[in-house]
């Protein structure tokens, strides 16, 4: 069961470049909508796996988990961010996206963490690939990170909404579950380690999330994940205070 009720980014004012809240700006509006909708969904489909696609994604996953106690809950997470990461790298490096391995973890939002240390092109680490090529690594990084984090805003500015990207990801995650593909993808779910819902590499199949993988991130990336966790915990405290 795909859960996507709520106000979108443009209508909710989360489409402004430089906005420090980003998708979290939608939290106070979509919170009561989920509190109304989720119990009704559970009553209608008590055995359904719940796939959340509403922003702010990770807090909505956590809220759904609380409202649907004991049910299987996950969210599209940073799957779309990771695809944007690969696409941006492919454009800059003139390499097919299928030849690139790249992950975005943490919040599906402004505190997301691009795992640069794990990027490979044809199984070759990015730093090794760039050595001897006339590509400035820092310039590449700034350009790609802006594209990944602001990509939704640029799409909304151009056509009013960003439905096709997330629609493709929703369809793919549903397919993975229905076919029991047991594929490792960056989706959002509650993490016992971090105490909040966020995106990590997880093996997904017909029973939802089957495994959670621990990434050997470098110090900078781990600090980024910690900041993402704190941002999401702060968001959940806002929800708790609203009740």
What is the meaning of each model-derived region?
Residues 18-88:
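Rossmann-like NAD(P)(H) cofactor-binding subdomain of soluble oxidoreductases
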Residues 7, 24-25, 35, 145-148, ...:
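N-terminal/domain-start segments enriched in small and hydrophobic, helix-friendly residues
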Residues 67-72, 81-243:
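C-terminal substrate-binding/catalytic lobe of Rossmann-fold NAD(P)-dependent dehydrogenases
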Residues 8, 30, 55, 152-154, ...:
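Detector for Asparagine
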């Amino acid at each position: 069961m795909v859960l996507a009720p709520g106000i979108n980014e443009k209508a909710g004012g989360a489409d402004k470049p430089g906005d420090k809240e980003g998708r979290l700006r939608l939290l106070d509006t979509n919170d009561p909508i989920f509190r109304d909708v989720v119990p009704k969904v559970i009553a209608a489909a008590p055995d359904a796996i719940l796939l959340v696609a509403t922003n702010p994604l990770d807090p909505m996953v956590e809220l759904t988990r609380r409202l649907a106690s004991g049910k299987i809950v996950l969210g599209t997470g940073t799957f779309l961010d990771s695809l944007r990461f690969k696409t941006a790298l492919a454009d800059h490096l003139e390499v097919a996206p299928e030849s690139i391995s790249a992950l975005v973890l943490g919040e599906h939002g402004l505190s997301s963490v691009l795992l640069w240390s794990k990027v490979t092109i044809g199984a070759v680490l990015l730093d090794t690939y760039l050595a001897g090529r006339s590509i400035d690594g820092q310039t590449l990084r700034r350009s790609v990170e802006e594209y990944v984090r602001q990509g939704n805003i640029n799409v909304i500015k151009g056509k009013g909404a960003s439905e096709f990207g997330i629609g493709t990801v929703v369809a793919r995650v549903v397919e993975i579950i229905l076919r029991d593909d047991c594929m490792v993808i960056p989706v959002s779910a509650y993490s016992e380690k971090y105490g909040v819902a966020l995106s990590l590499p997880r093996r997904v199949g017909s029973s939802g999330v089957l495994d959670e993988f621990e990434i050997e991130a470098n110090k900078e990336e781990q600090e980024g994940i910690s900041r993402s966790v704190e941002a999401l915990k702060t968001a959940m405290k806002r929800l708790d205070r609203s009740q």
